[in-house]
């Protein structure tokens, strides 16, 4: 008995047309997108925690308490009083103790040691979480097509970050050179790379939150001009973060505690006192804080322009993303002024650094939604 036919089906003696074959996107190995996204979200949270702990390590002047770089054996802290005394004796050999911390007893040293040890230990945890996740998904063949390289990159950069951290600490482990902290250039490099890793993780998390088909379709409605503006906004925010790291490295946030002027002047006193001239832009605390303020004003002004343009987007979620990014930036500007007026106490300073993470990620999300808009339903 022949099968039933639809009343709209064309009648013929020929064989029925073969079912449509899936396209390249449909045939691609989907992998475990949800599980990988969750794993990257854990890494993202750990990197944010690392930035906060790193900031607290700097604010408590703890970064030079461990004078040796032992990536493996350093995971074990001192276990006996003799071990603690040996570590303290090593610390007593560097300039920070001789010039700044001779008042310290062993109990005081333990306090700063634990901060630095915790910071390094968290780095080891991040490396372990990345390795277990990546190789687990790789062996299970659950990585989506085209994603292997993208998932390797955070791990490679994490390894580089560990080396940069050692390089940074080495700049402050001096004897007779007068260094009592790490070099501000190296601190800025260390923090900048942390934000690069954070940005890569955030972008991947956003991509994995949608299917390849959805992303491919969304690219057809990319808001190219707005994407370019958001890219500039993101880069300017990143530059401001690097300058903020220079301010932190020089402890420049406590030098001038008035606003909007600096010591009653528009430009701080002696802005070009160092020689050669270029050093002032990186090593003069007054000029570096002045530059941080000026770039902050530029970032806000540019943000107003981008926000007004973003509000005209045809996509509701894109508009919301720009509203969120601008709101966070406005709050960050206010918090920056408060940080100056209160001479950068550690509680406000660390909140200022954490909010910088929020501003950076929210601007990045707005940029992502320009590249991959989410269509708004006609029904609203």
Swiss-Prot record:
Name any Gene Ontology BP term: heme A biosynthetic process
Pathway given for this chain reads: Porphyrin-containing compound metabolism; heme A biosynthesis; heme A from heme O: step 1/1
Which locations, inside or outside the cell, does it occupy?
A: Cell membrane
Q: One Pfam match, by short name? A: COX15-CtaA
For membrane topology, the record states: Multi-pass membrane protein
What reaction is this protein's catalytic activity?
Fe(II)-heme o + 2 A + H2O = Fe(II)-heme a + 2 AH2
Query: Mind listing the UniProt keywords for this protein, alphabetically?
Result: Cell membrane, Heme biosynthesis, Iron, Membrane, Metal-binding, Oxidoreductase, Transmembrane, Transmembrane helix
**Keyword Cytoplasm on entry:** no
The signal peptide stretch is none
What this protein needs as a cofactor is: heme b
Where does this chain mainly localize? membrane
List the molecular function annotations (GO) for this entry: metal ion binding; oxidoreductase activity, acting on NAD(P)H, heme protein as acceptor
- Subunit text: Interacts with CtaB.
Q: Which family does it belong to?
A: Belongs to the COX15/CtaA family. Type 2 subfamily.
- What protein does this entry describe? Heme A synthase
Species assigned in the record: Ruegeria pomeroyi (strain ATCC 700808 / DSM 15171 / DSS-3) (Silicibacter pomeroyi)
Q: Which gene encodes it?
A: ctaA
């Amino acid at each position: 008995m022949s099968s039933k036919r639809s009343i709209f089906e064309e009648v013929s003696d020929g064989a029925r047309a073969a079912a449509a074959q899936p396209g390249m996107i449909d045939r691609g190995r989907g992998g475990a997108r949800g599980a990988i996204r969750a794993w990257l979200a854990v890494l993202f949270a750990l990197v944010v925690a690392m930035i906060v702990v790193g900031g607290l390590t700097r604010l408590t002047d703890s970064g030079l308490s461990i004078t040796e770089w032992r990536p493996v054996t350093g995971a074990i802290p001192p276990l006996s009083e003799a071990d603690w005394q040996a570590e303290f004796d090593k610390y007593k050999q560097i300039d920070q103790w001789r010039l700044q911390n001779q008042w310290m007893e062993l109990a005081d040293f333990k306090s700063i040691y634990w901060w630095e040890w915790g910071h390094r230990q968290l780095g080891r945890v991040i490396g372990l979480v990345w390795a277990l996740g990546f190789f687990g998904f790789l062996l299970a063949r659950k990585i989506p097509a085209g994603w292997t390289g993208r998932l390797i990159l955070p791990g490679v950069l994490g390894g580089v970050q560990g080396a940069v951290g050692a390089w940074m600490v080495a700049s402050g482990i001096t004897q007779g050179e007068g260094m009592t902290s790490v070099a501000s250039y190296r601190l800025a490099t260390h923090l900048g790379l942390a934000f690069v890793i954070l940005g890569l993780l955030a972008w991947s998390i956003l991509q994995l939150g949608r299917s390849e088909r959805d992303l491919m379709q969304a690219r057809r409605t990319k808001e190219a001009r707005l994407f370019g503006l958001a890219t500039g906004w993101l880069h300017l925010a990143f530059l401001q973060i690097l300058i903020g790291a220079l301010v932190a490295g020089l402890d420049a946030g406590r030098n001038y505690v008035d606003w909007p002027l600096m010591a009653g002047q528009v430009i701080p006193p002696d802005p070009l006192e160092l020689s050669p001239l270029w050093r002032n832009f990186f090593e003069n605390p007054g000029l570096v804080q002045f530059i941080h303020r000026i770039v902050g004003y530029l970032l806000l002004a540019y943000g107003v322009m981008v926000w007004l343009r973003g509000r005209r987007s045809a996509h509701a979620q894109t508009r919301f993303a720009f509203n969120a990014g601008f709101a966070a930036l406005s709050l960050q500007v206010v918090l920056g002024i408060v940080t100056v007026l209160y001479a950068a106490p550690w509680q406000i300073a660390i909140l200022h650094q954490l909010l910088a993470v929020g501003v950076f990620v929210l601007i990045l999300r707005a940029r992502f939604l320009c590249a991959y808009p989410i269509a708004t339903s006609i029904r609203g």
